[in-house]
Swiss-Prot record:
NCBIfam families: menD. Transmembrane segments: none annotated. This is 2-succinyl-5-enolpyruvyl-6-hydroxy-3-cyclohexene-1-carboxylate synthase. Keywords: Magnesium, Manganese, Metal-binding, Thiamine pyrophosphate, Transferase. SUPFAM superfamilies: Thiamin diphosphate-binding fold (THDP-binding). Binds 1 thiamine pyrophosphate per subunit. Pathway: Quinol/quinone metabolism; 1,4-dihydroxy-2-naphthoate biosynthesis; 1,4-dihydroxy-2-naphthoate from chorismate: step 2/7; Cofactor biosynthesis; phylloquinone biosynthesis. The gene is menD. Belongs to the TPP enzyme family. MenD subfamily.
Length: 578
């Protein structure tokens, strides 16, 4: 009980609890704190789903969220979410009950060496004494809770606390009543506790030549929610001061009115972006966006690149071309920002040229993608941002949806807050994480394919239980459409489907309704506005399904890229002639 109380004092507000006997002391303590109003408790029967749900809560709130499991294979099921938390720098507390040391390595039931299951991806592994948690006094438990919290938030990521429990595990009802009658909550912590801010360290590495052209590549946001406003202010000031173009990843968490944004860079790169005769400087923020075209372009530019991470000291440069700084953009910009009076005001000539190309891309997409008729995935992504309220966040499944949003979403859609798995880029836990995000943020739209949704169908249990305002827009193309965008032979079709696309004979509408989730089927793009309005008005989890043609959409994407490249070549040819 004291351990969870001390974690709550540190700032823990939410726990996701999975069933088990060995974890009964933790379950009873969590339930008691929830009844006292000290924290929120969510229950889930699937540990993998539970961990991703906690990941969504932590990502949206910026606070570490705890998952409690019993021993054995329950711990192994936490690994996928722990991997994503590690790669995406999301604070996650993994509290696992265990058998005492005397039962290890002797064939005892449900007793495994779970201490090592999560170690490779956790910021730290902590454990109470092998004889049982009851051997720790209150001062030791307070120290354990403080250490756990600081490890999770210091360099944000998952931490694993393994807790051996000796029997008896289940106090009597009378004992529980006596305990809670005498229970005195810890004094209020005075607000959310974060680790102390590190002292600002001057950057003594190379600095861009601000008088020369450059470009900002803003990758997926990898920092604590509390640090995002400072990051946004620094990015805004940098873009205004330099006039550099900003190639923006959908997950970059950029401010709404950021100047210099180039949205359709992935479509523009094959035609070749005009660059200065001298090498173009590149400022990269966070990990690279997931684009082979961008990687090839950056590799061709060569050295003269800077990479700024938000406290992540690990190497984030697979290209091996950048000087990396882990101070965070706000601190780095404070160290190196130029005197604005020394630079010409307004957008750079490079930004002006790239904006002309982006306008051509937007015009070509508007011509090629209809606003009505049968639904294609590119057309859906192009029109959808214009139909959603500007402040409504979106989660994009880490398959075709996140790629299509990057390529085809209308350039005037604004810097909408988007979430996805771009750390390890898996489809595990897609629905469970979206439910966690919506529980914390309020209304949210999840764009997902059929396999990603089916892969995490247990997430519907969380959605129906908590009734978050989540609108799931299912793009059902009968299998893994992402594989049609990769250089994989698609003939014969039967072999491709069997080995890669793997279509499943499951009715997703019936599956959702079995979990008491309202559903609607859309037949055309014209159905979309009314269906979205209906779904958002429900203020609970709903499913909208659109069916698309996987093969036709793969061909459409290729055609759109060809047409855009030709249009850009015409524009650049006209510019050179002029």
């Amino acid at each position: 009980m004291s351990l969870l109380a001390h974690l709550q004092h540190q700032g823990l507000r939410q726990i996701v609890l999975c069933p088990g006997s060995r974890s009964a002391p933790l379950a009873l303590a969590a339930g008691g704190l929830a009844r006292q109003g000290e924290l929120t408790l969510v229950t889930a029967i699937d540990e993998r789903s539970a961990a991703f749900h906690a990941l969504g809560l932590a990502q949206a709130s910026g606070r570490a969220t705890a998952v409690i499991t019993t021993s054995g294979t329950a711990v192994a099921n936490l690994l996928p979410a722990a991997v994503e938390a590690d790669r995406s720098c999301i604070p996650l507390l993994l509290l696992t009950a265990d058998r005492p040391t005397r039962l290890k390595d002797c064939g005892a039931n449900q007793t495994v060496n779970q201490e090592q299951f999560l170690a490779p991806v956790c910021r730290a592994f902590l454990s109470s004494p092998g004889e049982g948690l009851h051997h720790e006094n209150d001062v030791q438990l307070q120290s354990l809770a403080s250490s756990l919290w600081e490890r999770a938030l210091g360099s944000a990521g998952p931490v694993h606390l393994n807790l051996p429990f000796e029997e008896p595990l289940h106090p009597s009802e009378a004992e529980q009543q006596a305990f809670w009658s005498a229970w005195q909550p810890l004094p209020a912590a005075g607000g959310e506790h974060h680790p102390a801010e590190p002292r600002s360290t001057p950057w003594d590495g190379p600095v861009p030549d601000w008088s020369r052209p450059g470009v900002v590549v803003a990758g997926p946001w990898r920092g604590l929610e509390a640090d995002r406003p400072a990051y946004q202010r620094a990015l805004q000031e940098l873009a205004l001061t330099t006039g550099w173009p900003v190639l923006l990843d959908p997950l970059a968490a950029a401010p709404q009115d950021l100047p210099g944004v180039i949205r359709h860079w992935d479509l523009m790169l094959p035609a070749g972006l005009p660059t200065p005769e001298r090498s173009l400087q590149v400022l990269r923020l966070g990990p690279l966006p997931a684009s082979r075209r961008l990687e090839a372009w950056l590799r061709a530019l060569g050295p003269g690149q800077w990479l700024i991470s938000e406290g992540d000291c690990r190497s984030l440069d697979p290209l091996g071309l950048a000087s990396q700084c882990s101070l965070g953009l706000a601190s780095w910009w404070d160290c190196v920002s130029p005197n604005p009076l020394s630079l010409a005001p307004g957008p750079s000539s490079l930004l002006t040229a790239w904006r002309d190309l982006e306008a051509a891309v937007a015009g070509e997409l508007a011509r090629q993608l209809p606003q009505a008729g049968p639904v294609s995935e590119p057309a859906l992504m192009h029109v959808l941002p214009q139909l959603l309220p500007p402040a409504l966040p979106v989660m994009l499944a880490a398959s075709s949806p996140v790629r299509d949003w990057q390529a085809f979403a209308a350039a005037d859609a604004g810097q909408r807050r988007c979430f996805s798995f771009r750390g390890a880029s898996g489809i595990d836990g897609t629905l469970s994480l979206a439910v966690g995000l919506s529980r914390e943020l309020g209304p949210l739209v999840l764009l997902t394919g059929d396999l990603a949704l089916l892969h995490d169908s247990n997430g519907w249990l969380l959605a129906s239980a908590s009734a978050p305002p989540l609108l799931v827009l299912l793009i059902d193309n009968g299998g893994g459409g992402i594989f049609g965008q990769l250089p994989i032979p698609t003939a014969p079709a039967a072999a491709f489907d069997h080995l890669f696309a793997m279509p499943q004979a499951v009715d997703p509408l019936a599956l959702a309704r079995a979990h008491a989730v309202p559903t609607r089927q859309l037949a055309s793009l014209e159905d979309l506005p009314q269906a979205l309005e209906w779904g958002l008005d429900q203020r609970r989890a709903v499913l909208l399904r659109v069916c698309t043609n996987r093969g036709a959409d793969a061909a459409l994407r290729q055609m759109l890229r060809r047409e855009v490249e030709q249009a850009l070549c015409v524009v650049q040819g006209s510019t050179k002639e002029g």
